[in-house]
Regions:
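Residue-level recognition of tetratricopeptide repeat
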Residues: 33, 67-68, 103, 136-140, ...
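Residue at a conserved register position within TPR or TPR-like alpha-solenoid repeats
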Residues: 44, 78, 114, 148-149, ...
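Structural motif corresponding to the intra-repeat A-B loop/turn of tetratricopeptide repeats
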Residues: 47, 81-82, 117, 151-152, ...
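TPR alpha-solenoid repeat register
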Residues: 70, 140-141, 175, 210, ...
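Alpha-helical repeat scaffolds
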Residues: 85-98, 121-131, 155-168, 189-202, ...
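Short, charge-rich amphipathic alpha-helical segments embedded
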Residues: 51, 55-86, 132-145, 150
Length: 443
């Protein structure tokens, strides 16, 4: 039995619930559990809550292993080339050979496959066109906003579409999410975006991604204590869902904690931030899950990256403690990150104590480790996914640490290096998915 779309409309459930989908693609099946799990999975994909989406798609396939949309969903949330990806691609190809597809099912399948193939611009354009033609297709309208935001559409047109969607569905948490998401990179999020994010989190209080986005916008607005509260709520919600999610894949849970530590630092609660960072560094596992990968890069190095932001050069004991907490395995890319950050921080301490010759030699070590990181660019681009995101963030953190060291060491040219640092900090950090991120470069 297939999972078939019934028509070209999606039903918008009046009442929000964590157990039942809000956006519902009508499917032909004698098993209501299949449709429920499939739509919950598609909602999680929309939010890029990938670890929870995997759970729902697995449940869909347990109900009917011939559900083509569930196989497509699995392709969306597994890295290409992984054993899981190959398994579901093979299953999908076998089903497509004999399938009789309805037009809407064929459209969604082909468009999501276009997305899986990496054609973000084409997929975004397709959903935009569909949302214009089929005004009742709320899911298409949401995908239009999210994908075109990722594709870097700017200006009033996308905001207008998001506002129109929200006017038609004022109590739909996904329409609210779409409007809030558009202010993700704004240095001053609008009142409309903040209100949308708040209402979305209130409608689905058990969804950690919505708390993350609201916390992110609050932090961007300077409302740091409120942001910390939202990150705490996100962590609690994500922890509650670990019964469905392998801890090794718990990206959202870890991002909540990383963002909380970052916000504590930004709020001036530096003791709290450092305490949290050392706690997180103890939660690192060198496994292959996406949560493990995230913590290997971000959790390990967090104490060092916070010390980089300290206005005055840290004491040697603090540097040593942070390096010990990192303890990256020798020969790994993260070890270059660790050694680069340590050398850059030490350079500042040496410069402040006027040991300029030793400081210069130490800075050279930091620059050498950064050079080694740059040599890994091709490998990381081939790996893609979360590894590439973490690698790009590590590069930016190391560059910022070295520029701060140069400012401390080269007094005669510190204005030049400060300009370079300001330029670096003005660039958006590499995106984490879900689409919120802890910012560690800014003091």
């Amino acid at each position: 039995m297939h999972c078939w779309a019934e028509d070209n409309t999606l039903q918008n459930q009046a009442e929000s619930s964590a157990e039942n989908p809000v956006l519902r693609l009508a499917v032909v099946s004698d098993n209501p559990e299949l449709a429920r799990q499939l739509n919950l999975g598609l909602e999680c994909c929309l939010l890029n809550y990938q670890e929870k989406a995997r759970y729902h798609f697995r449940q869909s396939l347990a109900a009917d292993d011939a559900c083509m949309m569930a196989h497509v969903g699995m392709l969306m949330v597994h890295p290409s080339g992984s054993p899981e990806y190959k398994e579901h691609l093979q299953a999908l190809n076998a089903l497509l050979d004999t399938a009789m597809l309805t037009p809407v099912e064929e459209w969604y399948l082909s468009t999501f496959l276009q997305y899986i193939a990496g054609d973000l611009q084409g997929t975004a354009a397709a959903f935009k066109k569909r949302a214009e033609v089929y005004r009742r297709d709320t899911m298409a309208a949401c995908w239009d906003i999210v994908l075109n935001h990722y594709a870097a559409e700017q200006g009033g047109n996308i905001v207008s579409r998001a506002n129109h969607l929200l006017q038609n569905h004022p109590d739909n948490p996904f329409a609210l999410f779409c409007r809030a998401l558009l202010d993700e990179y704004s240095s001053s999020p609008t009142v409309e975006a903040l209100q949308a994010a708040q209402k979305a989190a209130e409608l689905l209080p058990g969804n950690p991604v919505l708390h993350l986005l609201y916390g992110h916008l609050l932090r961007r607005s300077g409302r740091l204590e409120e942001a910390i509260s939202q990150y705490r709520a996100a962590r609690m919600a994500a922890t509650n869902e670990l019964e469905f999610i392998n801890t090794a894949d718990a990206v959202t849970c870890h991002i909540s904690s990383l963002a909380k530590a970052s916000s504590c630092w930004q709020a001036g609660r530096r003791i709290d931030a450092l305490r949290l960072s050392f706690e997180l560094s103890k939660q690192v596992n060198d496994g292959a899950g996406e949560g493990d990968i995230l913590m290997h890069w971000e959790g390990r190095t967090l104490p060092l990256r916070l010390l980089v932001l300290q206005p005055t050069a840290p004491a040697g004991t603090a540097i040593n403690a942070a390096a010990k907490a990192c303890n990256a395995p020798v020969g790994t890319p993260v070890r270059h990150v660790q050694d680069c950050l340590v050398a850059a921080i030490q350079t500042r301490s040496l410069a402040e104590s006027r040991r300029l010759s030793t400081a210069t030699q130490t800075l050279l070590k930091a620059e050498q480790h950064l050079s080694e990181l740059f040599k890994l660019s091709d490998d990381m681009n081939r790996a893609g996914g979360l590894r590439l995101t973490c690698y790009n963030r590590a590069l930016q953190a190391c560059q910022g640490a070295i520029l701060r060291a140069r400012i401390a060491l080269y007094a005669d040219s510190k204005d030049i290096w400060q300009t370079h640092l300001d330029e670096l900090l003005s660039k958006p950090e590499a995106r984490f998915l879900p689409p919120v991120l802890p910012e560690f470069n800014k003091p």
